[in-house]
């Protein structure tokens, strides 16, 4: 077993670590830093970070999270469909068109109901 064969792998790992760490250190060293109380305070979704954990907050955050999950799942279904489109033929194409139409109808419904308005 010749360890010289593993040199490119070691070099690849070292370059990858360097690409990740060098910009961080350069930014830390070269970037201007003028911290004040406002910049050092934690920001969490527009609320004070150190309040009661059981405080009420707007239900629209839940709605946006649910909508994000739904459209994220739609994207998760679209990728394998696009990869296998040649193999599944017209039936697969038609079923995905129906799937997308259902999502479009649902999106238009929540849009018309005003669920996306942040007023």
Swiss-Prot record:
Keywords: Cell membrane, Membrane, NAD, Quinone, Translocase, Transmembrane, Transmembrane helix, Transport, Ubiquinone
Stored Pfam families: Oxidored_q4
EC number(s) reported in the record: 7.1.1.-
The reaction(s) this protein catalyses: a quinone + NADH + 5 H(+)(in) = a quinol + NAD(+) + 4 H(+)(out)
Alphabetized GO MF terms: NADH dehydrogenase (ubiquinone) activity; NADH:ubiquinone reductase (non-electrogenic) activity; quinone binding
Gene3D superfamilies per the UniProt record, alphabetical: NADH:ubiquinone/plastoquinone oxidoreductase, chain 3 (1.20.58.1610)
Main subcellular location of this protein, as a coarse class: membrane
Compartment(s) of residence: Cell membrane
Membrane topology: Multi-pass membrane protein
Source domain of life: Bacteria
Gene Ontology terms: cellular component: NADH dehydrogenase complex; plasma membrane
Transmembrane segments: 7-27, 63-83, 88-108
Classification via HAMAP family: NDH1_NuoA (MF_01394)
Subunit architecture: NDH-1 is composed of 14 different subunits. Subunits NuoA, H, J, K, L, M, N constitute the membrane sector of the complex.
Functional summary from the UniProt entry: NDH-1 shuttles electrons from NADH, via FMN and iron-sulfur (Fe-S) centers, to quinones in the respiratory chain. The immediate electron acceptor for the enzyme in this species is believed to be ubiquinone. Couples the redox reaction to proton translocation (for every two electrons transferred, four hydrogen ions are translocated across the cytoplasmic membrane), and thus conserves the redox energy in a proton gradient.
Entry similarity comment: Belongs to the complex I subunit 3 family.
Name used for this protein in its record: NADH-quinone oxidoreductase subunit A
Organism (species): Polynucleobacter asymbioticus (strain DSM 18221 / CIP 109841 / QLW-P1DMWA-1)
Taxonomic lineage of the native organism: Bacteria, Pseudomonadati, Pseudomonadota, Betaproteobacteria, Burkholderiales
